[in-house]
């Protein structure tokens, strides 16, 4: 069976699962102090690229790729191009991509959120872009602190994010199922997607 056919068959189940999921009224776990108690990505919130608060519970029932991005990195073109391609081919199957700009690595994302949004538009980005954040240190966004300590979110040689375009694969229940290093291109994730749709 082709992946496209599988996606069409599973789409109604994904939508029903998202609507029937328990705990939709739960409180967000977005503070700097209580992130350790979270059980899924869906308990967090983040500001989108336009500064609006987004409850990540909206991704319940979807498979997500969460990545830190930068516009002036040597890996920018290949990552943006492949992420746009993955999103175009699998969004209908239930894939969502969450891109978090970050300036912590070589100061390669120096622009404002508006400038980053304009840059991403040059790649015809249709996936969700968030406001610029830190992914390491005390000021790291709580979601990123949480993802790094999950059993399948830990890194090689420590849990810190090593560079731009570290990617986390998150299942429909909001659990981290795999971490991909910055040198792994997004197309590598494609082989893992069918298990989680």
Curated annotation (Swiss-Prot):
It is an enzyme of class 1 (oxidoreductase). It comes from the Eukaryota. Its EC number is 1.11.1.12, 1.11.1.9. Keywords: Cytoplasm, Developmental protein, Lipid metabolism, Mitochondrion, Oxidoreductase, Peroxidase, Phosphoprotein, Selenocysteine, Transit peptide. PROSITE patterns: GLUTATHIONE_PEROXID_1 (PS00460), GLUTATHIONE_PEROXID_2 (PS00763), GLUTATHIONE_PEROXID_3 (PS51355). GO terms for cellular component: cytosol; mitochondrion; nuclear envelope; protein-containing complex. The active site is at residue 73. The modification Phosphoserine is found at residue 40. Expressed in testis. Also expressed in liver, lung, kidney and spinal cord. One of its GO terms (molecular function) is phospholipid-hydroperoxide glutathione peroxidase activity. It catalyses: a hydroperoxy polyunsaturated fatty acid + 2 glutathione = a hydroxy polyunsaturated fatty acid + glutathione disulfide + H2O; 2 glutathione + H2O2 = glutathione disulfide + 2 H2O; tert-butyl hydroperoxide + 2 glutathione = tert-butanol + glutathione disulfide + H2O; cumene hydroperoxide + 2 glutathione = 2-phenylpropan-2-ol + glutathione disulfide + H2O. Signal peptide: none annotated. Monomer. Has a tendency to form higher mass oligomers. Interacts with FUNDC1; this interaction promotes GPX4 recruitment into mitochondria through TOM/TIM complex where it is degraded by mitophagy. Belongs to the glutathione peroxidase family. This is Phospholipid hydroperoxide glutathione peroxidase. The lineage of its organism: Eukaryota, Metazoa, Chordata, Craniata, Vertebrata.
